[in-house]
Amino acid sequence: MATTASNHYNLLGSGSSIVHADPGGMQQAQSYRDAQTLVQSDYTLQSNGHPLSHAHQWITALSHGDGAPWATSPLGQQDIKPTVQSSRDELHGSGTLQHQSRAPHLVHPAHGNHHGPGAWRSTGSTHLSSMASSNGQGLLYSQPSFTVNGMINPGSGQGMHHHGLRDSHDDHHGDHGHQQPSQTQQQQQQHSQLQGGHHDHSDEDTPTSDDLEQFAKQFKQRRIKLGFTQADVGLALGTLYGNVFSQTTICRFEALQLSFKNMCKLKPLLNKWLEEADSSSGSPTSIDKIAAQGRKRKKRTSIEVSVKGALESHFLKCPKPAAQEITSLADSLQLEKEVVRVWFCNRRQKEKRMTPPGGTIPGAEDVYGASRDTPPHLGVQTSVQ
């Protein structure tokens, strides 16, 4: 590889007439070799004592010189791994030969006698491009900084002459990187504080499921004791507070069958109604007037067990009594006539639900006008042979 690089530089020097065999040029080369000796001693590795490659020292010398024409080479940005052991052995074996062939090329453009830095840049770029395309291995001149044992540092994608720009660029981005997270953290902290305050406030106002269950139980007991129906409560809420609720909604609230959200909305309204009803108990208030206006049907009458037993015994004798019988029965039981009539209607409907299809209903013989002993659907039974 070193021989190939040397041949290319010999062709380049002969074609471009860059090499001049004048005494001044030889003195410049000699001074360059002395400088290289000093640079080589400065860049000796501390781990194994082997100096860096001559090509890398040449890159370092150019980066600190005045010309520095290789700073804009596109191949200097590439991270190319050479064959470490073979390249290092060849470079150590032929270091003096490369210095003698490359010294005039390196020193000459610094004085600018025939070619300026632009010519060196264009010629060097063309030469390195041709070598990169023809040779399978990477170029030694475009290698970045080496670490121990000649391995390429994976973090150094650029040459050493770009360290200053790269460091300043990293510092600039580092400042922005530190500023952006700090601003983001401040915004997140403010947002979390707002959310935390909101959640604390909502948690204090929102009742738990146990609170709702306890309130529903107390509300039902107080409502029944005060003598109001579920429909009365729904109508009173609509008239007093502007939210009309049906009897079904109040029933589902007492049975804990509403959603948690709807239970939480309905609880404060029912609590206000309950407080007003408790404070006005014993005197006619607006709630009583509203309940009286809203009642389209009578209250449900609760019948005592003894009275219900007397009605049951009379139903077994006559499921459908006449009007005179209903009146006499109501007077004997101290009930309203309408209450007794409704009770017999409901009892007959219950008996229909309890009787299987094709069965008989107690008292049906009276409906059809037959005697109790011989129902119409029962005839003389004959044995089947």
UniProtKB/Swiss-Prot annotation:
Pfam entry (one): Pou
Polar residues bias (residue ranges): 122-136
Subcellular location: Nucleus
Listed Basic and acidic residues bias regions: 165-178
DNA-binding residues (ranges): 296-355
Classification via InterPro entries: HD (IPR001356), Homeobox_CS (IPR017970), Homeodomain-like_sf (IPR009057), Lambda_DNA-bd_dom_sf (IPR010982), POU (IPR013847), POU_dom (IPR000327), POU_domain_TF (IPR050255), TF_POU_3 (IPR016362)
Known role: Transcription factor that may be implicated in patterning of the central nervous system during early development.
Similarity section: Belongs to the POU transcription factor family. Class-3 subfamily.
Record-given protein name: POU domain, class 3, transcription factor 2-B
